[in-house]
Amino acid sequence: GTGLTIGENVVGMDPEAVFKGGRIVDTVDLKRRVKLYKDYQHDGYGAIIVQANVEDSRLKVQEYAIGELGVECVELKWGQGAKDIGGEVKIKDLKKAQMLQERGYIVLPNPNDPNVIKAFEMGAFKEFERHSRVGMITEESFAKTVDGLRKAGAKYIFLKTGAYRPADLARAVSFSSKYKLDLLTVDAA
């Protein structure tokens, strides 16, 4: 079968997503994407893979996908893979920029600053930038994350990273082996 990865930030960018206590409890967009895949999945072959970055991890997106949507495969992400940037998106709507900041994203300029709001409304600038954080990994936090995903029911756990410094690449290989991940992707290597 064919695997299909649902990338990062799908839940955080979903204007209809519902959160409680800082966690996702309902999402139209992720449910739609998983359902579309499953509707065309043949005899259970293949897998839908839900990727997560720092913001997704904070919102417990993968745990929701496993527990509520029956997803069995998740992918952790270190950095932006092949891109040496932080996952920027342009936002042309003030309310959406404010919503994203409330969900924990870095939004520039600050969409809740009264001076920024006034400048935006006067046309001084036309868009905000939403940035994703680049996570800093310790072995302890990585082990805890993998253990939590396994306890949540993940059958397969992947890691995606970029072709970074040799020490960081060695860490990815070492952690993937030590914590028995199912796949390591080194993007743009």
Q: Where are the predicted features?
A:
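Active-site entrance/lid segments in N-terminal catalytic domains of soluble metabolic enzymes
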Residues: 1-189
